Amino acid sequence: MTQVTNRQTLLEKVGRKWKSDPIFSTGLVLALMVILQTVALGFDYESFGAWFTNWGKNWINILRNNAGVGIVALGMTFVIISGGIDLAVGSTMVAIGAVIMVFINQYPDGLLTAIGITGVPAYAIGIVAGVIFGCLLGGISGVLIARSKLPAFIATLGMMKILRSVTQQVMQTAAVKVPSSFLAISNTKIGGEVILPILYWLVAAVILHIVSRYTPFGRHVYAVGSNERTARLSGVNVERVKGLIYVLMGALVAVTAVIQVSRIGSMDYANAGSGYEMDAIAAAIIGGGGRHQHERRTRLHSGHGAGHADHRRDEQPAQPDGRAALPARGVQGIHRDRRGAFAKEGSYRLTARQRKERKEKSMLNIGIIG
């Protein structure tokens, strides 16, 4: 009886610790993952010695292969905490990768050298252009969401379709290669192993942890996600914060694009980045994007708009508008080239909300409604 009571007490303590201490819960999950993955990896080798020798290498491979998603998930955490979502990260990564590779191939001797700046790698201009382009794309999403009041789901879904389509149209099947010096960004060995992508991931995690905990911007992100109206009354520029969140997201996607292109040396414009958004969203939620407040999890699962307390039109649960999806899907049926159809579908999704609101407004003006 005493053993059962002690066991229950221990479980209760662990449960309370799990709910109150995010570091403890994260560490427990990671420990469980290590144990399960270690056992699974053990089945691939004939002897314990072979398993032990390759244990570290296997974990390095796992972390290296997930570094890109991990970096994107860091930005997605900010997005989800603020009450938003970003479905365009995969397509954005492909578009940025295309820009990087085009710049590298257009200026193989270095644009900086041409204007008198020496000692800088030829691919530096490509990286800078990629990061700027990523921030620009993130800024566009931020403006659509913060200024145009488009739901984040619709805005980023439209951006996803447009970016994927335009990138495929522009690049076609062009096989663009990058110089070996650029490959060194991710493939340089340290201690006999390729761990640079993991280090980039860790550095980004540390920087963004500091930003979220110890800067006004980090506090404003939590304030906006908790209650937009209260944040606005407290002097927070909600639109600016939302815009900067998506700019940050674009910059992190650009970093991921640099890592991916420099690892592989090429990019599949049709399939690269597919599923990145879902993996990043899942990682952000599991890792803590939705755990700081119960309300954040509720919003993510219940279908309520992130600003449902702030605007009359969002006071009731948001309903998926299937009517807007039907003609958008039909666009693909009347175009043989699916790449062009995706761009048209994305444009339709971005404008559907405004068209619906204009229609309701005109009906109110002529007295059909109310």
Predicted regions and their residues:
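Cytosolic-side transmembrane-helix boundaries in multi-pass membrane proteins
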Residues: M1-I35, V39, V206, L233, ...
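Membrane-interfacial amphipathic/re-entrant helices at transmembrane-helix boundaries
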Residues: T2-I71, P108-I125, Q354
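Transmembrane helix-bundle core of multi-pass membrane transporters
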Residues: R16, A124, S148, A152-Y214, ...
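Single transmembrane alpha-helix segments in multi-pass membrane proteins
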Residues: Q37-L41, W55-Y107, V143-L150, A284-T298, ...
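Inter-helical junctions in multi-pass inner-membrane proteins, predominant
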Residues: F43-N61, T167-V170, K189-V194, S212, ...
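Alpha-helical transmembrane segments within multi-pass membrane transporters and channels
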Residues: D109-M159, A306-G307, H311
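Helix-loop-helix "hairpin" substructures at the membrane interface of multi-pass membrane proteins
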Residues: Y123-V128, L136-S141, E193-D268
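Transmembrane alpha-helical segments in multi-pass inner-membrane proteins
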Residues: V247, V253, I264, D268-G333
